[in-house]
């Protein structure tokens, strides 16, 4: 005699409680890998990686990009030990708009015997010259950008002042209308170099005026430097201060990365959608309601494990080991006809990832070297046979 199974595993993970809205839309990175992808390749593959020009070196362990949209591609499957290895397969791909980032400052850390890493000092330097240089190098011949270098710098400084008024002050009679306050950055840098630091990190800024979003306010994030010795990392950070970094200086085609960001918000939802609770059939006592869990608890009070309605989505989450299919400098190579829906045109550098990732379009995402990499370490990206440029309207 058939009957319903009354016992089942619980619905919904308890590992992501509390299911509340993220505090900030720009995620804070709580942990960094101890080795960069380049260090892992040399360690695991040895001469095979060295012959490809890969060597351990100081490198930023993270980058920032905006989610533009999705398409699909046909590639040659280069994964070993799969039944499609060496054959053409169709895969979904996600395109990220990845304009260069500006290194506004450095932050040195010392170790406190009781509290761990504590900030020792900061150095800030104007990125205006670097912004003009990267515009002339990457975006000046772009037919879709109608702004000049002067307008780009002015809009960036105006947006940066809204984020941190202490860094930029208005100067109506100057070339850009604003001035970046450096405040003796050379003396502060020498003080940092003379101190016995335990770690040094960069303070990076996005350049949204060069993306397809159309906003001016940049995001500021701290990024750790990995690889090499501490003195090599300090020298590398000194070279980056006040300059720009492109995505191909941080990542390599074919490697795996982690995606950190805030998921798409769903608002206030019930237990069926929020936890996947079994919806029982409506019977003659349906006046008591359907799509509910019935009794929440015994009389002593509600248990926290019981599914209840509430906020769904807009949570800070991390996705591990997403593979980079391609890194390019001309965004119109991957922009479909009519642009990405709800985003528009990718003007400059971009990243193509295998599969889907968290967040809606235009969401800021932090890309990090893998903190728990897989057992397979590919040296190259798979061969792309076809990429779909067809319009996504109505799909």
UniProtKB/Swiss-Prot annotation:
Region of interest (Disordered), ranges: 286-313
InterPro entries: L3_arc_euk, Ribosomal_L3_dom_3_arc_sf, Ribosomal_uL3, Ribosomal_uL3_arc, Ribosomal_uL3_CS, Transl_B-barrel_sf
Function: One of the primary rRNA binding proteins, it binds directly near the 3'-end of the 23S rRNA, where it nucleates assembly of the 50S subunit.
Family annotation (NCBIfam families): PRK04231.1
GO molecular function: rRNA binding; structural constituent of ribosome
Superkingdom in the source lineage: Archaea
Oligomeric form and interacting partners: Part of the 50S ribosomal subunit. Forms a cluster with proteins L14 and L24e.
Keywords: Ribonucleoprotein, Ribosomal protein, RNA-binding, rRNA-binding
Keyword field contains Magnesium: no
Family: Belongs to the universal ribosomal protein uL3 family.
One GO term describing the cellular component: cytosolic large ribosomal subunit
HAMAP family: Ribosomal_uL3_A
GO terms of biological process kind: translation
Protein name listed in UniProt: Large ribosomal subunit protein uL3
PANTHER family cross-referenced by the UniProt entry: 60S RIBOSOMAL PROTEIN L3-RELATED, LARGE RIBOSOMAL SUBUNIT PROTEIN UL3
UniProt cross-references to Pfam families, sorted A to Z: Ribosomal_L3
């Amino acid at each position: 005699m058939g009957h319903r199974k009354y016992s089942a595993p619980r619905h919904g993970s308890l590992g992501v409680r509390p299911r509340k809205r993220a505090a900030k839309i720009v995620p804070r990175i709580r942990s960094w890998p101890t080795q960069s992808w380049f260090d892992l390749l040399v360690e695991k593959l040895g001469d095979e990686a060295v012959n490809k020009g890969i060597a351990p070196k100081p490198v930023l362990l993270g980058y920032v990009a905006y989610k533009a949209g999705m398409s699909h591609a046909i590639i040659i499957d280069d994964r070993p030990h799969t039944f499609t290895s060496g054959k053409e397969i169709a895969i979904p791909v996600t395109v990220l708009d990845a304009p260069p980032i500006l290194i506004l400052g450095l932050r040195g850390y010392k170790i406190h015997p009781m509290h761990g890493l504590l900030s020792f000092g900061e150095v800030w330097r104007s990125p205006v010259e670097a912004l003009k240089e990267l515009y002339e190098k990457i975006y000046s011949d772009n037919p879709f950008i109608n702004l000049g270098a002067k307008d780009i710098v002015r809009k960036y400084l105006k947006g940066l002042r809204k984020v941190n008024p202490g860094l930029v002050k208005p100067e109506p009679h100057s070339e850009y209308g604003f001035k970046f306050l450096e405040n003796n950055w050379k003396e502060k840098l020498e003080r940092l170099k003379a101190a016995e630091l335990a770690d040094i990190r960069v303070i990076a800024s996005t350049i949204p005026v060069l993306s397809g979003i159309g906003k001016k306010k940049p995001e500021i994030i701290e990024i750790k430097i990995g690889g090499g010795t501490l003195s090599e990392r300090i020298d590398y950070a000194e070279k980056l201060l006040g300059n720009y970094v492109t995505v191909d200086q941080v990542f390599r085609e074919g490697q795996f990365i982690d995606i950190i960001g805030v998921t798409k918000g769903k608002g206030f939802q019930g237990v069926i959608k929020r936890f996947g609770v079994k919806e029982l059939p409506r019977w003659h006592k349906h006046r008591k309601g359907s799509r509910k869990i019935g009794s929440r608890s015994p009389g002593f009070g509600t248990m926290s494990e019981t599914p209840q309605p509430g906020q769904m989505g807009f949570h800070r989450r991390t996705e591990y080991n997403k593979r980079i299919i391609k890194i390019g400098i001309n965004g119109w190579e991957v922009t479909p006809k009519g642009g990405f829906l709800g985003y528009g045109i990718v003007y400059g550098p971009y990243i193509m990832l295998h599969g889907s990732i968290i967040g809606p379009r235009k969401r800021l995402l932090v890309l990090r070297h893998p903190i728990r990499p897989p057992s397979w370490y590919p040296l190259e990206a798979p061969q792309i046979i076809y990429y779909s440029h067809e319009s996504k309207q109505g799909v």
